[in-house]
């Protein structure tokens, strides 16, 4: 048989920002190995599952993860040994039981997720399947429309731009490989435009440029210029997607949004809604993530009522990949899409449940990386397995981001003639 778990190993490794993270090896009785490493975020939702850090300031500035590693070796491994790696749900449930907290603060979501993903990898390897085939079965044939981060601002950079991510989406591409080519061409064109304007072309955490632009609007203007100069039509071939991460701008005391990196302007919730409505009229924006702060549910409702039938409105900090928050959003008719970050919730089973709930309610789902990544490519397989049709995994630079795109290119090749790329049609929450 050989598919039972023989042993689980774990170690502290380094992520793309030089911070420690957890890697786990699940070894089966027949010697099959499944290995996975977990990511971590810079801007985090307050309701996210807890990433266990050691807190010893003299080691890695307190960011060590040896406690999480020990929890895998001393608590999780002895309990999972002998269990079938082919029963992902049972494995994940067992870890949730062992943890016993609502936010995984005892064992750490980073410990639990590493084992959850490594188990799926071991099971797939044992069966001679690719991870996307194992998790998605015969239905896994949709390649995602990528959200490629090309300009960074806010908490991801040191410039005068308030909004965290300006992305492009190649909605007019015919295949995934075309989508990557088009995005790379715009990325390189943007680099030369920024260079000619005298801006720096160094890249941020997620591989996008972080030039010291004069305003938020200028970021959209240079992207439009790059799309056109690369030979594409904005809004038809390539659309703009934003992640302003407004929870980082929101002052809960005054209930105002403070443009702290640029004009120092303060906007009420209603004014922020009007601001986005104007931008959607002015630029070919197809998606806005976290357009309102995570605690501003009223603002979210106003935003959804105002432009939710025109563009994709993604809840990230709002939902933190959690079915209880998503349920509230669905009931209140707030947002129309959810960002799926495996480490926000902590197991593959719960991730599948969140996507299932979103799809049933007519919400779109976008599988996402974090700003602190590794060479692990599980999310590339996951997006195909889940069939969500959208992925957000950074820019067309930095190996930690490119690893995911390259894995998707391999999957597209393997699928051959049954591979599908839906482009603009993935936006079923607005394509009504």
UniProtKB/Swiss-Prot annotation:
InterPro entries: Enolase, Enolase-like_C_sf, Enolase-like_N, Enolase_C, Enolase_CS, Enolase_N. It is an enzyme of class 4 (lyase). Its EC number is 4.2.1.11. CDD domains: enolase. It catalyses: (2R)-2-phosphoglycerate = phosphoenolpyruvate + H2O. One of its GO terms (biological process) is glycolytic process. One of its GO terms (cellular component) is phosphopyruvate hydratase complex. The active site is at residues 206, 341. Binds a second Mg(2+) ion via substrate during catalysis. Keywords: Cytoplasm, Glycolysis, Lyase, Magnesium, Metal-binding, Secreted. (2R)-2-phosphoglycerate binds at residues 164, 341, 370-371, 392. Pathway: Carbohydrate degradation; glycolysis; pyruvate from D-glyceraldehyde 3-phosphate: step 4/5. GO terms for molecular function: magnesium ion binding; phosphopyruvate hydratase activity. Catalyzes the reversible conversion of 2-phosphoglycerate (2-PG) into phosphoenolpyruvate (PEP). It is essential for the degradation of carbohydrates via glycolysis. NCBIfam families: eno. This is Enolase. The gene is eno.
């Amino acid at each position: 048989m050989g598919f039972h778990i023989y042993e689980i190993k774990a170690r502290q490794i380094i992520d793309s920002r030089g911070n420690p993270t957890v890697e786990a090896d699940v070894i089966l009785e027949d010697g099959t190995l499944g290995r996975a490493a977990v990511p971590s975020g810079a801007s985090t939702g307050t309701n996210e599952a807890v990433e266990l850090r050691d807190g010893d300031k003299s080691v890695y500035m307190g960011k060590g993860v040896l406690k999480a590693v020990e929890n895998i070796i001393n608590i999780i491994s002895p309990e999972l040994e002998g269990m079938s790696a082919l029963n992902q749900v049972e494995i994940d449930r067992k870890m949730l039981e062992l943890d016993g907290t609502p936010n995984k603060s005892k064992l750490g979501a980073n410990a639990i997720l590493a084992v959850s993903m490594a188990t799926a990898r071991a099971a797939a390897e044992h069966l001679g399947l690719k991870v996307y085939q194992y998790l998605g079965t015969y239905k896994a044939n949709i390649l995602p429309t990528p959200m490629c981060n090309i300009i960074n601002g806010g908490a991801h950079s040191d410039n005068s731009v308030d909004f965290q991510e300006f992305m492009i989406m190649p909605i007019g591409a015919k295949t995934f490989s075309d989508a990557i080519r088009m995005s790379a061409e715009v990325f390189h064109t943007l680099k030369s435009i920024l260079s000619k304007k005298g801006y720096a072309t160094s890249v941020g955490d997620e591989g996008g440029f972080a030039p010291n632009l004069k305003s938020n609007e200028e970021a959209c203007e240079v992207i439009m210029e790059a799309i056109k100069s690369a030979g594409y039509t904005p809004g038809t071939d390539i659309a703009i997607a934003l992640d302003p991460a407004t929870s980082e701008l929101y002052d809960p005391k005054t209930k105002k949004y403070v443009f702290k990196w640029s004009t120092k302007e303060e906007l009420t919730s209603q004014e922020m809604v009007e601001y986005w409505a104007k931008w959607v009229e002015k630029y070919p924006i197809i998606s806005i993530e976290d357009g309102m702060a995570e605690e501003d549910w009223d603002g979210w409702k106003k935003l959804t009522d105002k432009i939710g039938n025109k563009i994709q409105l993604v809840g990230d900090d709002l939902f933190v990949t959690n079915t209880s928050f998503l349920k509230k959003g669905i009931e209140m008719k707030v947002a129309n899409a959810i960002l799926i970050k495996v480490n926000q919730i902590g197991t593959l089973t719960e991730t599948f449940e969140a996507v299932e709930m979103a799809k049933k309610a007519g919400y779109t789902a976008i599988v996402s990386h974090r700003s602190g990544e590794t060479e692990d490519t599980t999310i590339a397989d996951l997006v195909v397995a889940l069939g969500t049709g959208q992925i957000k995994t950074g820019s067309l630079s930095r190996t930690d981001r490119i690893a995911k795109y390259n894995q998707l290119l391999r999957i597209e090749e393997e699928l051959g003639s049954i591979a599908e790329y839906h482009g603009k049609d993935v936006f079923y929450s607005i394509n009504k």
